[in-house]
């Protein structure tokens, strides 16, 4: 069974009297335990597509299916629960909460999802060990380096053991060494957890190391 399917996804924006089509009839199927790169020029709609796949933005038309169940039939409360339980997100800018520690940031989705404090803490500590930040548990995230912040964001994205990880330029704001560390962690942890990873990237070398690469060009998706 295909894990996630986008069928005939289109997205238009209104600019005065003009309608601007950004995505045109996108079809994309995502299988279990695969890494898919989405590449394309700046402004081609890559982030818009990722936001639609993450149910953060609604398409103008088209359908999303998760394990053959229509995602668009869910109400806002059900969508929020779906995102927290089944989708993990990591962005170019980590979006960590600066007033909280590394450990607290990673625990947050689990607590919101109804996990108790002890279970949330144990899972967060385990993930932070996996991303080699066990020595930074009680540090405020503002005291971490850029690479450490992004590794914290990765641990947070995995805390609910999602089926799909959506990554928007996760290495784009890092130096080459830190970016390589984050990518290797994404790949290795994804394989271990049998995640499907969908990554928007401008880095063609990273895209070539994934199972699949698709290109957004003039609003349409092309397989490479």
From Swiss-Prot:
Give UniProt keywords alphabetically: ATP-binding, Cell inner membrane, Cell membrane, Membrane, Nucleotide-binding, Translocase, Transport
Q: What's in the GO CC field?
A: plasma membrane
Drop me one GO molecular function for this one: ATP binding
Q: Binding positions for ATP?
A: 40-47
Q: Does the keyword Metal-binding apply?
A: no
InterPro entries reported for this sequence:
AAA+_ATPase, ABC_transporter-like_ATP-bd, MacB-like_ATP-bd, P-loop_NTPase
Tell me yes or no: is Nucleotidyltransferase among this UniProt entry's keywords.
Answer: no
Disulfide bonds, paired cysteine numbers:
none
Task: Look up the signal peptide feature and give its range.
Answer: none
Q: What is its main location?
A: membrane
Question: What is this entry's stated membrane topology?
Answer: Peripheral membrane protein
Check the record and name the SUPFAM superfamilies matching this protein: P-loop containing nucleoside triphosphate hydrolases
Q: Name one Pfam family in it.
A: ABC_tran
For this protein, the record's Gene3D superfamilies field holds: P-loop containing nucleotide triphosphate hydrolases (3.40.50.300)
Q: Which family does it belong to?
A: Belongs to the ABC transporter superfamily. Lipoprotein translocase (TC 3.A.1.125) family.
Role summary: Part of the ABC transporter complex LolCDE involved in the translocation of mature outer membrane-directed lipoproteins, from the inner membrane to the periplasmic chaperone, LolA. Responsible for the formation of the LolA-lipoprotein complex in an ATP-dependent manner.
Subunit description: The complex is composed of two ATP-binding proteins (LolD) and two transmembrane proteins (LolC and LolE).
Query: In its UniProt entry, what is this protein called?
Result: Lipoprotein-releasing system ATP-binding protein LolD
Instruction: Give the originating organism.
Output: Desulfotalea psychrophila (strain LSv54 / DSM 12343)
């Amino acid at each position: 069974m295909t894990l996630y399917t986008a069928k005939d996804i289109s997205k238009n924006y209104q600019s005065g009297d003009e309608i601007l089509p950004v995505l045109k009839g996108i079809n994309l199927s995502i299988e279990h335990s695969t890494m898919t790169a989405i590449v394309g020029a700046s402004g081609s709609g890559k982030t818009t597509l990722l936001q639609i796949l993450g149910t953060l933005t609604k398409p103008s038309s088209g359908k999303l299916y998760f394990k053959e169940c229509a995602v668009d039939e869910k109400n806002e409360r059900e969508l929020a629960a779906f995102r927290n339980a089944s989708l993990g997100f990591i962005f170019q800018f980590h979006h960590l909460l600066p007033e909280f520690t590394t450990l607290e940031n990673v625990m947050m989705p689990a607590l919101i999802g109804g996990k108790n404090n002890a279970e949330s803490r144990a899972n967060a500590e385990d993930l932070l060990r996996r991303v080699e930040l066990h020595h930074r548990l009680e540090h405020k995230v503002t005291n971490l380096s850029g690479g450490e912040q992004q590794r914290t964001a990765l641990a947070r994205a995995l805390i609910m053991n999602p089926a799909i990880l959506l990554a928007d330029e996760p290495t784009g704001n890092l130096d080459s060494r830190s970016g390589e560390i984050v990518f290797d962690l994404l790949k290795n942890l994804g394989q271990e957890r049998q995640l499907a990873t969908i990554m928007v990237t401008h880095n063609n070398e990273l895209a070539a190391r994934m199972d699949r690469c698709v290109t957004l060009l003039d609003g349409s998706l092309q397989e490479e």
